């Protein structure tokens, strides 16, 4: 068994506010038995701009994963009694052991595109140091928008019609092999408004309220036969009907409270409530609480 792993990452700043980078990862594993190779190619682009009033962060990520399927060993004698099939030799080369499938594979492809942007309202605070006046922007309120797109495809292909009908117990759609694809897509938009932590001496925490709308779409293999249809050589199709495609809309409203400044206690609490779609009535609350303090000559950190 051998595996190759090539990975490269680049990230650089054009100036104090603008950053850009990318990565690529290629993995190839040949497997221990015949028709067991696996490879994955993933690459991404990312960047950010962090200004006084406007911020944006984004990344684009794609991957393409292919896995050969051999269906397992077709003759256990090669493992249990190898001398019977190798002219008396007890040692066996695993790459010569026959498998159930010789021309089949699974392919999974995916994309994830994400961007979040924020516009901040606030004021500039001036501080004089020696003969220089330093202006520092103090954000008070911000408007937030986040967009996320996901797409995932799964395809199973078996190009051997003979192995397709002998290996699988049931064959419903055709006798010429298998080529089936399922797909999932979603796009999510979030709009929110927040009061930023520390904009004045009484603001001990940050507050945010938001609404999220998501549309999901599912695509399944096309039925080529009607229910109850029987063709010679095929397994009679069950009397069920699945939609070729299906879409659904989801809507959440939620809020956050957070405190990230200081060491004694920091926390982040997020809660959202489902208003429409399959998640209507759902309540989702996540929290992260941390504490750090000195104890004698050491530092104690607690997290929950």
Language-model features and meaning:
Residues 1, 5-27, 46-48:
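Predominantly transmembrane beta-strands of Gram-negative outer membrane beta-barrel pores used
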Residues 2-3, 28, 35-46, 185, ...:
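Short, glycine/acidic-rich beta->alpha junctions
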Residues 19-21, 87-92, 257-266:
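Active-site-adjacent bridging/hinge elements
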Residues 32-42, 46-109, 295-304:
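Outer-membrane beta-barrel translocator/channel fold
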Residues 21, 56-59, 142-146:
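A structural signal for short, well-ordered beta-strand segments and their strand-loop junctions
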Residues 1, 20-32, 264-277:
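Transmembrane beta-strand segments that form the barrel wall of outer-membrane beta-barrel proteins
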Residues 100-165, 169-304:
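Exposed, low-structure sequence patches enriched in small/polar residues
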Residues 28, 53, 62-66, 123, ...:
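Short loop/turn segments at secondary-structure transitions that flank enzyme active sites
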